[in-house]
Curated annotation (Swiss-Prot):
Keywords linked to the UniProt accession: Calcium, Disulfide bond, Metal-binding, Secreted, Signal
Cellular component annotations (GO), alphabetically ordered: extracellular region
Gene assigned in the entry: PLA2G2C
Cofactor note: Binds 1 Ca(2+) ion per subunit.
Organism this protein belongs to: Homo sapiens
Protein name (database record): Putative inactive group IIC secretory phospholipase A2
Main location: secreted
Gene Ontology process terms (BP): arachidonate secretion; lipid catabolic process; phosphatidylcholine metabolic process; phosphatidylglycerol metabolic process
Binding, Ca(2+): 45, 47, 49
Length: 149
């Protein structure tokens, strides 16, 4: 039963990433950690928390914080639905699209680039990753509002 609940959560409650499964593969390959089990619910911004003051660099670089994902939505792109192709060459992510030119390909490439930025930030902040901040977003310490930038 728990497996079904987790899969439902993954499919319907992960609006912060384009193609969750591709994002998961990239995070795992680049950081060695699971996107869902290591980052979802981390701090105040990773996952659906999205409020309060970021607790550390990992949280500050979360895709939920003000990000390129918001720009994608402004251009009528659907980051959750835009699957894309990518390859990892010498540790670097290379985004691709086989659909040819057009809005759909544009959205897919931009979604890939957004994920690329997030994964790169997660990699850079690995030394300061703190296990105590997992599932932290439900804590009252996160507050109710996003900080003003």
């Amino acid at each position: 039963m728990k497996v079904i609940a987790i899969l439902t959560l993954l499919l319907f409650c992960s609006p912060t990433h384009s193609s969750f499964w591709q994002f998961q593969r990239r995070v795992k390959h680049i950081t060695g950690r699971s996107a869902f089990f290591s980052y979802y619910g981390y701090g105040c911004y990773c996952g659906l928390g999205d409020k309060g003051i970021p607790v550390d660099d990992t949280d500050r670089h979360s895709p939920s914080s003000p990000s390129p994902y918001e720009k994608l939505k402004e251009f009528s792109c659907q980051p959750v639905l835009n699957s894309y192709q990518f390859h990892i060459v010498n540790g670097a992510v290379v985004c691709g699209c086989t659909l040819g030119p057009g809005a759909s390909c544009h959205c897919r490439l931009k979604a890939c680039e957004c994920d690329k930025q997030s994964v790169h930030c997660f990699k850079e902040s690995l030394p300061t990753y703190e296990k105590n901040f997992k599932q932290f977003s439900s804590q009252p310490r996160c507050g109710r509002h996003k900080p003003w930038c």
